[in-house]
Amino acid sequence: MAARGSRKPKPAQAGAPPPPVPRGRLSYADYLKVDDLLRLQAPVSAPPHHDEMQFVVVHQVFELWFRLLLHETDRIAAMLGRGDDGSLREAVHLLRRVARIAKELQPQIGLLDSMKPTRFLGFRSNLEPASGFQSYQFRELECAWGKKDPAMLAHLADAPERRARLERRLEAPSLRDRLGALLRTRGFDWPEGDGEDAGTRRARGLRRVYEAPSAHALLEELLEALLEADAQFALWRRHHVFMVERMIGRKWGTGGSQGVPYLETTLSARFFPEIWAARTHLERGPASEAPPA
């Protein structure tokens, strides 16, 4: 019989996280849950295909990077929402981190190039109907940065929890929304809407930042940090298209997509087209750099 006042420990629930390791006994493997990680690689080919393990590991690593990118993006969104100078400096710092991560993703795609196309074909059919289209974290990332496409929900029709995550991202303000709200509070012309006229006005409105950087130094840093991250994401997409074409040519994707022809349509996409377009509308440099009359 238990002593008066004592409580029996509750049985662990299925799926509950393991109890924390006592202080002072934490190991590297415990902290990083290495044993759990190593149990997650489960190739499906039978008999096993040697190269499938590489395929699984590379894509799992991408998903871990996507998780970190979402973590950083949510913090950046919060800082833009606050809008004070201290928060904007933190946003700039984190945006530079995001750009570094996105840059690191590019050579990782090249790891798959070490697999011969014929080797990939040895297990590719076993993946159907799984597809990169179903990477809900990548779709969340696109939404969080401003590329919102409700049609992507169709790829998660059989996964209600994942679909709900993407729905929340579709409804929440994106980084692009946050930037627009910030610029409007600071007196910039940033109309809402997707029309060409609204886009042109937004791009022209940013001229003030670049043509008078001494008056808008922090905003210029913010815009350039957003642009650099945007550029690295665009380069990642380009690397991805080349890798896919190198592996499967113009075949359709395992999930029924058009494969490379579809991916090529995404290459011109930008999260912040106005920052790119602002370059077109610049007419002079800062006053201190203007040539003598």
Where are these regions (language model features)?
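Surface-exposed peri-terminal alpha-helical interaction modules
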Residues: 2-293
